[in-house]
Amino acid sequence: MGKTSKDKRDIYYRQAKDEGWRARSAFKLLHVDEAYGILNGVQRAVDLCAAPGSWSQVLSRKLYDTCETDDEKSAVKIIAVDLQAMAPIRGILQLQGDITKQSTAEAIIGHFGGNEKAQLVVCDGAPDVTGVHEMDEYMQHQLLVAALSIATCVLETGGTFVAKIFKGNATSLLSSQMQIFFKKFDIYKPPSSRPSSIEAFVVCSDFCLPEGYIPQVINPARDDIRLLAQKTGSEVNRRLVPFIACGDLNGLSDPEEGKTSSSDESKSNLEYVYDAVMDDASYPLEFKEILKQVYDEQRHII
């Protein structure tokens, strides 16, 4: 946890230190549980982008430590997934892996054993913040899509998915994407989330795959998603995967709608960010190269 003066004045920072949480973000999951009861009756859970482990600590204390017998403890299976290693947590199985790879989803299911899948998937991951709101929102959206795609592989029917989002212009689109797979969808900002922060959390329950949909692990910034969808041989995938990964609305409205004679007015948020960053000498070359890769990928897909 940080040690700035601002942090030290934060009640949740001090409380996290007193109660032994690795980060104040533990209270965000606790508040989500208080509001929605997401941990009730859960025995199998997955924590994506788990490091440093505060959400895994919550799962451990709420699901594992409350068990009274060894048999009850053996039935609880909690898997924490991250590229980085973490200090051990009681009752937590750590898996170092990339959530954008199919092998990670298979490893998670393998650890549950048999035909069992997760009842709950949580993700508090976020990209490095650039300070450019549109860029931060876009990158967080892509991370959320990656988390959603692996959740469709490891969640059992009726399961729950909770993940961080950055609220912005794409929030309504995000709602449409999530409701493809979940009957109940809500956006919640817990009291422990700083008022100045644009973060909130999607709380999705009653997971149900669309008929004919084949779960896939998607990396929106890397994969050719149209080709990926075609390989499944599923007509549903060919319609849904581009929409899920990129917000592709082709064919959903009048093709004449929204046309404008001004090329400047037709620019997307990403194009505005791209032009502004490329013209600004203060941004490091490495950041510009990453942005160019993302921009080229989206132009290729569209």
Curated annotation (Swiss-Prot):
Its main location: cytoplasm. Methylates the 2'-O-ribose of nucleotides at positions 32 of the tRNA anticodon loop of substrate tRNAs. Plays a role in neurogenesis. Requisite for RNA-mediated gene silencing. May modify position 32 in tRNA(Arg(ACG)), tRNA(Gln(CUG)), tRNA(Gln(UUG)), tRNA(Gln(CUC)), tRNA(Leu(CAA)), tRNA(Leu(CAG)), tRNA(Phe(GAA)), tRNA(Trp(CCA)), tRNA(Val(TAC)), tRNA(Val(CAC)), and tRNA(Val(AAC)). Keywords: Cytoplasm, Methyltransferase, S-adenosyl-L-methionine, Transferase, tRNA processing. S-adenosyl-L-methionine binds at residues 53, 55, 82, 98, 124. Its EC number is 2.1.1.205. The keyword tRNA processing applies. This is tRNA (cytidine(32)-2'-O)-methyltransferase. One of its GO terms (molecular function) is S-adenosyl-L-methionine binding. Disruption phenotype: Impairs long-term memory functioning with no apparent effect on short-term memory. RNAi-mediated knockdown impairs small interfering RNA-mediated silencing and leads to derepression of piRNA pathway-mediated transposable element silencing. Simultaneous knockdown of Trm7-34 decreases lifespan. It comes from Drosophila melanogaster. One of its GO terms (cellular component) is cytoplasm. The active site is at residue 164. GO terms for biological process: cytoplasmic translation; neurogenesis; tRNA methylation; tRNA nucleoside ribose methylation. Belongs to the class I-like SAM-binding methyltransferase superfamily. RNA methyltransferase RlmE family. TRM7 subfamily. Pfam families: FtsJ (PF01728). It catalyses: cytidine(32)/guanosine(34) in tRNA + 2 S-adenosyl-L-methionine = 2'-O-methylcytidine(32)/2'-O-methylguanosine(34) in tRNA + 2 S-adenosyl-L-homocysteine + 2 H(+). It is found in: Cytoplasm.
